[in-house]
From Swiss-Prot:
PANTHER family xrefs: N-(5'-PHOSPHORIBOSYL)ANTHRANILATE ISOMERASE
UniProt catalytic activity: N-(5-phospho-beta-D-ribosyl)anthranilate = 1-(2-carboxyphenylamino)-1-deoxy-D-ribulose 5-phosphate
Family membership noted in the UniProt record: Belongs to the TrpF family.
UniProt pathway: Amino-acid biosynthesis; L-tryptophan biosynthesis; L-tryptophan from chorismate: step 3/5
Organism of derivation: Synechocystis sp. (strain ATCC 27184 / PCC 6803 / Kazusa)
Keyword terms of this UniProt record: Amino-acid biosynthesis, Aromatic amino acid biosynthesis, Isomerase, Tryptophan biosynthesis
GO MF annotation: an example: phosphoribosylanthranilate isomerase activity
E.C. number: 5.3.1.24
GO biological process assignments: L-tryptophan biosynthetic process
Protein name in the entry: N-(5'-phosphoribosyl)anthranilate isomerase
Top-rank taxon, per record: Bacteria
Gene that this sequence comes from: trpF
Origin organism lineage: Bacteria, Bacillati, Cyanobacteriota, Cyanophyceae, Synechococcales
Amino acid sequence: MAMEVKICGLRHPAQAQAIAALGFTTLGFICVEASSRYVSSREIELVLQSLTAHNKRSAIGVFANVSLPKLGEFLAQTSLNGIQLHGDESPDFCRQVKQAFPQHRLIKALRLRRSADLERAEAYYNAVDVLLLDAYHPEQLGGTGQTLPWQKLQQFRPPLPWWLAGGLTPSNVQEALNLLQPDGIDLSSGVEQGPADKDVAKVAQLRAQLDALAILQH
């Protein structure tokens, strides 16, 4: 089973280098100003410039309820090659983003409050490249540390790649992946010491747990 692993909420170049050296080269940057993990376009470029070409495989900016012009303005200032929409974006808006930025991989996060929320996923099947399932929090868009009810997701098999997020840590990732077969996983608070301050030792523990499951990145 090949699986992509995204480490999200990066800010510090040295931490990004260490994480990439562990084999995790899908990196996420929070571009939502209200978030404690927010990074500016300049900070993102400092991180990406610190990485070798080999380790720059996928740099994803996380946005929420941003206008198309504002999104374009931010993307023009960075070398991001992926867009993650983590707010209340409609399928139609996602299609507009995909049309405006066809070279960027488009990920839509669905924050699940209840199992029935999964029904919303179908409307996005032909609008995005990847679906990401995250836990709902009334005040935070992500990085909440809250997990999803994994057993209730076992029948979720959309016709496009999907990633699992929500409270994943080195301690519980094996349990989650024994129950589910996502195409990717997304970790933030589970591998950090504080907002945007990644714990490289925890990332190394994550690598060891995934190696034990013989899960390789693409």
